[in-house]
Design a protein with these regions (language model features):
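Short beta->alpha hinge that forms the Motif I/post-I loop of the SAM-binding pocket
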Residues: 34-35, 70, 95
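NAD(P)+-binding Rossmann beta1-loop-alpha1 motif at the extreme N-terminus of oxidoreductases
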Residues: 1-54, 60, 65
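Rossmann-fold dinucleotide-binding core
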Residues: 109-155
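Glycine/small-residue-rich loop that forms an oxyanion/phosphate-binding "nest" at active or ligand-binding sites
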Residues: 81-124, 130
Length: 155
């Protein structure tokens, strides 16, 4: 069984989680979000299976994939923690529009073998989990910027 982690469950993170739940209902989804209401909604609606009370939750170390869907400063902070706890083969990705600073941090941390930067070209004028939609990424470009050592089988 694949385990997917989300740090940030707003419009984009929530939309990706909803799509994963729809197309891969057997996957185990964990999430952290600043808004406890969003987590409660995601849990009660069956989108996620587990709530992480903090972004540095050790359960993220059990994930096969971790989506960083928070503001870039928080994503940068999470990278160092994830480096210490991630299991072999875990792929970490982000959904931010800024790539230079996050790839610089990935290189500094020696994580070029497990990081795939991502930028979904989708969104809405609305924000938050309540406005997320499993179809928001349909027919949208999703630009990937993998680290230099990521195996092609992960892309």
């Amino acid at each position: 069984m694949n385990t997917i982690g989300f740090i940030g469950l707003g419009l984009i993170g929530g939309s990706i989680a909803k799509a994963i739940r729809k197309y891969h209902p057997d996957y185990h989804i964990l999430a952290y979000n600043r808004s406890k209401e969003a987590l409660a909604s995601a849990l009660s609606s069956g989108i996620i299976d587990g709530v992480c009370e903090e972004m540095k939750d050790p359960r993220f170390g059990t994930c096969d994939y971790v989506f960083l869907c928070a503001p870039v400063e928080i994503n940068l902070e999470c990278l160092a923690y994830l480096k210490e706890i991630r299991q072999d083969g875990c792929i970490i990705t982000d959904v931010g529009s800024v790539k230079g600073i996050i790839h610089q941090k990935v290189e500094e941390l020696g994580m070029t073998d497990c990081f795939i930067g991502g930028h979904p070209m989708a969104g809405s004028e609305k924000t938050g989990f309540d406005h997320s939609n499993e179809r928001i990424l349909e027919n949208a470009y999703y630009i990937l910027t993998p680290g230099g050592e990521v195996g092609l089988e992960y892309i």
